[in-house]
Amino acid sequence: MVSPQIANMGTIADLTTKNFKLSDGNVFQVKNDSFAPVTLEVKLASMSDEDDFVSTSFAVGWNPEIVREIKANASHTNVSLKWGY
C-alpha cells in the first residue's frame, strides 16, 4: 500500500487523444480512481524523451512509480486518473 504525501494534485484528462505530462516538467505519481487496475505506457522520471515508453500496471489508488509522461491510448475512455506530487 502506498501512502505518499501529495501537495499538488490534478486530473489527467484527454488521455484518449494526447499524451499527458505536466507543463512545468515536474514528475508525478499516478492515482488510479477507477475500479480496476489499468495498464499504461509511461516514461519514468529518469527516462529521456528519446527513450521508449514502458508498459506497467497501475493498481487502484496511489501508485509508487514516479512518472514524467503517459502515452495516449484510445481505449482509455473509462479510466479515471489523477496526478500528484
Model-predicted regions and their roles:
Residues 1-85:
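Surface-exposed, low-hydrophobicity beta-strand/loop segments enriched in small/polar/acidic residues
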